[in-house]
Amino acid sequence: LQQFSLSRDTSHLIPVLKEILALNPAIKIMGSPWSPPVWMKSNKNSVGGNLNPQHYSVYAQYFVRYIQAMKAHGITIDAITPQNEPQHGGNNPSLVMSAAQQTDFIKNHLGPAFQAAGINTKIVVWDHNCNRPDYPIAILDDPAAKAFVHGSAFHLYEGDVSALTQVHQAHPDKALYFTEQWTGSNSSFDGDLKWHIKNVIIGTMRNWSGVALEWNLANDPAFGPHTPGGCTQCKGAVTIEGSNATKNVSYYII
């Protein structure tokens, strides 16, 4: 990890996060990667592929370095997920990670690395749709992995929000998060407001979630910036055009 650097983030991301924290120091920051560096992956590509088992330990150290580097900038990473949407290998970037692979990574590499470095950042598993409650349950059914895990995270592009209750019933001592749902450029304001309040805000809380996140916070009128192949119609809570900010439906959902 001799080339590890946050230099790309110091221009925009880190200054914005510091401004947010200055306005509200109680804000919690969660990190969820789309992909490891491509040299750690089976296909040496930003799209899809798996994390090579021989790189599990170095990727765990990558998380450690990231959390420590952000802390040096005054930003505490409250929680991380090992992988955003680990069953979605078509995005650019993305990574496919099975429940067995995530279990191995957490119990044998990430958890021990955090422990050795004295890092208290929470580890949250799954971070994908409500159609697969079996995925986080499989991880939590492994006692060695469970010892390092704070909870499970969900999205609702597939499945039913009651999946959170299934995980709660299997492991009531672990937290539940709802970490992503987007509103689209072609959707109606009233339709999105009704659906998100019913499912994302009320529905998740009635199914044991302590967190409900809208995605994303802000973008420009062309729904950028985004990665090549990234979402071209995901609307921010606010649209930024020059010095003007327009509030969108996610602003009112939040």
What do the predicted segments below correspond to?
Residues 82-88:
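Short, conserved phosphate-binding/catalytic loop or strand-edge motifs used
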Residues 1-77, 108:
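N-terminal catalytic cores of secreted or lumenal carbohydrate-active enzymes
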Residues 37-38, 86, 185:
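Feature marks short, surface-exposed loop/turn motifs that line or immediately flank catalytic pockets
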Residues 4-8, 166, 254:
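Generic low-polarity alpha-helical segments
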Residues 31, 61-68, 73-78, 89-253:
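Substrate-binding and catalytic surfaces of secreted/luminal carbohydrate-active proteins
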